[in-house]
């Protein structure tokens, strides 16, 4: 099995682009990984195509991992615990892709004390909150990010831009509960969206929504049991409001129980 693992701390050591740490762009620095091109967040593994990579976030498949036409990935580095990339010999529980599996896990939150972390970049700002609800038993993590380059449109004094929209945002959440010495419940979710429109010429947007509920039980020092319910929903919308208005919607949605 060929697998590379990166922690959030290692990912943040990589030089940032426009103040944003990009998880997928960091992977292109690993052996056998190449970018699909400048200004794109996809990646190729050992000659495979970008659509041959299975990307999962807390067990939920992600069908579009890009913000801003591929300029950034949807994964907020402040909400990521670690990243595993399987480049060959993928485990049997992963399927549907030929090239690789990118397994991203969200942070579980601080179980001892409350903490906050944030940052302001050239294109977006972010904020992460984490802490205990019941100390050492129930804890949470919340992270949000939004771009604000659309707020500068009025400064250009172009009437068409005043009616234009261009932004992205995403939210990450995770709740962990230790219900007994042997049982834990994990609930995680992600929601993100990109929205663009140019006056009455066109409008389009896309977004992902994933959620995972997992029960973990320790049977013995060598054995444990996991049961998961995973939901993933991807939407893409295209339309226009001019003389020939139209709306076109596309959607991929699935529910998996493991």
Over which residues does each language-model region extend?
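Membrane-embedded beta-strand positions in outer-membrane beta-barrel channels/transporters
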Residues: 24, 42, 82, 87, ...
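Short glycine/proline-enriched turns and hinge-like loops at secondary-structure junctions
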Residues: 95-97
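Structural signature of outer-membrane beta-barrel domains
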Residues: 50, 60-62, 107, 123, ...
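Short strand-turn segments of transmembrane beta-barrel domains in outer membranes
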Residues: 70-73, 81-91, 100-131, 139-146, ...
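Periplasmic N-terminal accessory/gating domains of Gram-negative outer-membrane beta-barrel systems
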Residues: 1-90, 101, 107-108
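Extracellular loop and loop/strand-boundary signature of outer-membrane beta-barrel proteins
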Residues: 67, 113-115, 157-161, 196-202, ...
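Transmembrane beta-barrel wall of Gram-negative outer-membrane proteins
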Residues: 121-146, 160-195, 203-231
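Short sequence motifs at beta-strands and strand-loop junctions characteristic
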Residues: 17, 36-37, 119-121, 163-167, ...
């Amino acid at each position: 099995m060929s697998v590379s693992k990166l922690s959030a701390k290692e990912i943040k050591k990589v030089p940032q682009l426009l103040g944003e740490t990009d998880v997928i762009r960091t992977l292109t620095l690993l052996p056998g990984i190449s970018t699909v091109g400048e200004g794109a967040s996809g990646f190729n593994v050992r000659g495979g195509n970008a659509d041959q990579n299975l990307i999962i976030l807390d067990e939920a498949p992600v069908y579009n991992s890009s913000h801003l036409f591929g300029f950034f990935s949807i994964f907020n580095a402040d909400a990521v615990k670690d990243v595993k990339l399987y480049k060959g010999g993928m485990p049997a529980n992963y399927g549907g892709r030929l090239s690789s599996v990118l397994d991203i896990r969200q942070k579980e939150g601080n179980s001892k004390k409350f903490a906050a972390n944030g940052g302001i970049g050239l294109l977006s700002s972010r904020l992460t909150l984490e802490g205990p609800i019941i100390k050492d038993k129930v804890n949470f993590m919340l992270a949000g990010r939004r771009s604000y380059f659309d707020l500068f449109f009025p400064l250009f004094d172009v009437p068409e831009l005043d009616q234009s929209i261009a932004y992205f945002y995403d939210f990450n959440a995770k709740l962990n509960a230790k219900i007994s010495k042997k049982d834990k419940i994990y609930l995680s979710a992600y929601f993100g969206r990109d929205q663009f429109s140019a006056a009455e010429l066109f409008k389009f947007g896309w977004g992902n929504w994933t959620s995972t509920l997992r029960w973990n039980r320790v049977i013995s020092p060598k054995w444990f049991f996991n049961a998961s319910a995973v939901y993933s929903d991807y939407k893409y919308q295209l339309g226009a409001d001019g003389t020939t208005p139209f709306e076109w919607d596309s959607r991929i949605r699935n529910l998996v129980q493991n």
